[in-house]
């Protein structure tokens, strides 16, 4: 029993016409893309035989996803003007220099030098850096930071003295402390304290007011009860 060709039911006029069959055969032989032959059919065996050929043709023309991915990975990436700046989050931040850690001995020497000299010349700074085993930049940076701290503390001290009651407390401290009294009396008489604006003679008792204590073996001095009192009203006049 022979199988029936479905084309004879769809196009019976063209199927039975020999001229039409000859034209179809000629067109199938000349066109490589669309092959139409009289022997083609819709049988399962014929379809299975044609599917490998069709898949091979599709592989030649359609690139696979793997090939596209490989081409994209191997192709050089186009760099945009802002590509380098946006490459990583940390690239935009400026790299910070490592903070210098000074030893206790170095800090002590720096503090002693700063106490004597608030500003250093280039030669003095180089000598100090060489003596302590530091670089000139490290000493310069420390001095700048220390001067900033010193100015800030001085400003805070002046603000405290401007408050009511603080000025009199400082005056009492200078009057009652032998340390400050001896320190200030060593200065020329008539010199004014920058933070108080008062002459030394009005703040510090004269030198003869300090008498060594006879009842104690301690070499420390004491203030005589006859030391003059501070008269702030005279300064206001």
UniProtKB/Swiss-Prot annotation:
Effect of gene disruption? Answer: Worms undergo programmed cell death of CEM (cephalic male) sensory neurons in males.
Annotated Polar residues bias:
68-78
Residues of the region (Disordered) are 49-98, 209-237
* Cellular compartment(s): Nucleus
Q: Which domain of life is it from?
A: Eukaryota
| DNA-binding region of this protein | 95-154
What Pfam families is this protein classified in? Homeodomain
Q: Which SUPFAM superfamilies match?
A: Homeodomain-like (SSF46689)
UniProt keywords (A-Z) are: Developmental protein, Differentiation, DNA-binding, Homeobox, Nucleus, Sexual differentiation, Transcription, Transcription regulation
| CC annotations in GO | nucleus
Here the segments flagged for biased composition (Low complexity) are 212-228
Q: Which GO terms describe its molecular function?
A: DNA-binding transcription factor activity, RNA polymerase II-specific; RNA polymerase II transcription regulatory region sequence-specific DNA binding
Which GO annotations describe the biological process of this protein? cell differentiation; negative regulation of apoptotic process; nervous system development; regulation of transcription by RNA polymerase II; sex differentiation
Q: Which residues form a coiled coil?
A: none
Please give the tissue specificity annotation from the record for this chain. Expressed transiently in embryonic CEM (cephalic male) sensory neurons.
Query: What the protein does?
Result: Cell-type specific anti-apoptotic transcription factor required for the sexually dimorphic survival of the male-specific CEM (cephalic male) sensory neurons during sex determination. In hermaphrodites, the homologous cells undergo programmed cell death due to transcriptional repression of ceh-30 by tra-1, the terminal regulator in the sex determination pathway.
Check the record and name the PANTHER family matching this protein: HOMEO BOX HB9 LIKE A-RELATED, VENT HOMEOBOX
Q: What is this protein called?
A: Homeobox protein ceh-30
Q: Which organism is it from?
A: Caenorhabditis elegans
Q: Tell me the classification of the organism that encodes this protein.
A: Eukaryota, Metazoa, Ecdysozoa, Nematoda, Chromadorea
